[in-house]
Amino acid sequence: MTSKIFTVVMLAVLVGASGLSAATNETELSAVLASIKQVGTKGAGHRAAQAAWQKLADADAAQLPAILVALDDASPLAANWLRGATEAIVARRLADGGSLPTAALEEFLADRRHAPRSRRLAYEWLVRVDQTTADRLLPGMLDDPSLELRRDAVAQLIVQASAKGKQDPDAAKAILQTALQSARDLDQINDAIRKLGDLGVKIDLTSQLGFVTHWKVVGPFDNAGGRGFAVAYPPEKSVDLAATYPGKSGEVHWVEAEASDEMGHVDLNRALGTHKGAAAYAFAEFDSDAARPVELRLGSANASKIWLNGKPLEEAEVYHAFTTMDQYIGRGECKRGKNRILVKLCQNEQTEDWAAEWKFQLRVCDPTGGALEQQEKNP
Amino acid sequence: MNGNDANDEKEPMRRLRLGQPRTGKSFALGALGIGVFCLAMAAPVASGDWPQFRGPNSDGAILPSEISASSSGGNRRAAVTALDGPTTFDRGLTIGWKVDLPGRGPSSPIVVGGKVIVTASSGVRQDLLHVLAFDAADGHLLWQRQFWATGRTITHPQTANAAPTPTTDGNKIFAFFSSNDLVALDLDGSLLWYRGLAQDFPHLGNDVGMSSSPLVVGDTVVVQSESQGESFVAGIDTVDGTTRWQLERERAATWTSPALLPNGKEMAVLVESAKTISAIDPATGIVLWTHQQDCETISSACASGGLVFVPGKGMTALRVGAGSAEPVPAWTNNQLQCGAASPTVLGNRLYAINRGGVLMTADPASGKILSRTRLDGNFWSSPVAAKNRLFAVNFEGVGQLVEISRDGSSGKVVDKIPFGETMQASPAVAGGAVFVRGDGHLWKLVAGTEK
């Protein structure tokens, strides 16, 4: 018997041996949680997890904080097993007229070292049993790692600003500017900018979102039959803005391309001419004042690849299946000083009108989706 | 532009054409003499349940609650016992109840054991998945479970993560989402297992949104997920969620749903891609036959009376034999076109709603169009039919009851029901009631008084 199988069997034995009352000892709870957290892809570990899940779902509400802690490092699959059990516990407890361990949940929520999803869950339970929760806690969550908690905090500010309205425009402006600084979702950003505009404050959306607007682009290279997606044309090996390359139908060289709207869209049909079965590259640089985690967030209906400082971050071989902001996210580390972005955009050979699109947008963000403070460089 | 980043919203939906009245208002649908029809029961669901997308037969035919499906061999296909008879709709319909939903979703309700099961997705990133159970009798929420999506959640704004319709074997519920999350629950909401199929297939997903609804046959859940990145059809064990079999498919997007095909005493499952339709043994994954055939990638095929009706450059009927014998084309009619709504077949009537909102009534034996009836609006929801009447809900949320003459040569809209919100889900009919679902609400329509 391998050690892994032995572990699972022993966990199952422990799980089956007892219930999970409020007085359940730590070992029993750990065994149950471990049985669930070992679920893997393709249904691996389900049998053991099923037995454990029922035990966990029958647990006392006092166990909720411990289950939330277990959620912190659970895989996405295991997290849903755990969540399902917690919902059964909470629903049963509230239906019975009981209470939740609010003090422990609030303590858990306040500790930002816990996973955003776990803390959000704690918050939602607290809201269900304590109507003062939102007013008490959201003001301190404007910079929360949980984007859901942050969103609710921003929404609360926007409501406050609207209440101030024209009676106290300076206060409304200040509140909206705070909201805008914290907002990460496009609808809230647009809402805050529109309301600030009504108060005479103009905000540049493009900068707010961190779109890169100045690019050098080169192409077309051959992508007949989609084969060019996998071909490493010369810009993938090194970017030399003075170079010329053999292209799909003659020599090609780098040319300027500017974003054509406030959402940072760069139209390659405009910059390079209309082509089918073609590939192109876009290059830009930005400065960072420190080495830090960074996300290059791309939106494009064309097949794409993203590199940062020569390192591949993300690729998607998908053509014309909708596009939106932040569609593909390349996560990496930028360095202090100049950083180099390279994007490959492939156009296929579909002939429908809607398949003519060959464009992209890209923004440079921190891991929350906030625009990275950066000085964009014209390459 | 004001920061509206719903880029090219109209374009992808040209390809993907998916599929407030208050309590007491009588819609008086008029006399609905619902006949008794040939109905398949692929799983041991109770008579009166609506277990999956497009009902017990996955063909839009209503199972009258008054009729008990009789078992016919392993496939439990009921026999035709009468062509006329009293129905629960004879006295028209009235709103029974209306409840709020916590999120959006083109997914259709299903009904099992007196519970209406609905899925929804919410959150700015559509990453919160909901499975809800309502008491069919009074609409109160029995339980709700939420999960975090593990796959891609981007969709065109018209659709949502909760696009596929859940399914049931009568004891368990299987809820599927565009993010390729597949969750199994018992009828009390206890989690049985959770699969994130995008964890197995990292390139799986379609940012237009995926919508294929799973089917249960025996102890297998058949899931079809086809996209440019990866594509497969898989049979998932209903008990423990492991993969029983898996078929690699062409890497291309399709939004169609598997449909039931009686195969002797067993039940096969039809799956389509753009250029082929296949029949699969759900227990083993063995492909019984594959037929080269243009198929629409949105409206789904259905089977009845030994024929498979395939939307694709009009409609083609394939005559199927037993086992693995490849089907033979029976007829093609390029005028009989489906838009997003899937065809409905009931006895000797075949219905298709085209992209212009014209309902065509055809003879399923010959494909001949018997009549055309213009309906209001466009349809993403697939209609349900009973005897000589058909109920369809347009995108704007107007239910339309259409009466077709006995000989099929004419049709007329006899009533309209405005629900007041966008609707893409197909109606579910069970226990003498109709359940319709919009972007924010679930309604129950019950027998009312005749106009």
Predicted segments, located by residue:
Chain B
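N-terminal secretory signal peptides that target proteins for export/translocation
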Residues: 1-27
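Intrinsic disorder/low-complexity segments
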Residues: 23-24, 34, 69, 84
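Noncatalytic, solvent-exposed loop/strand surfaces
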Residues: 42-451
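Bacterial N-terminal signal peptides
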Residues: 30-42
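Compositionally biased, low-hydrophobicity segments enriched in charged and small polar residues
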Residues: 25-28, 32-33, 393
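Compositionally biased, intrinsically disordered low-complexity regions enriched in proline and serine
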Residues: 5-8, 21, 38, 51-54, ...
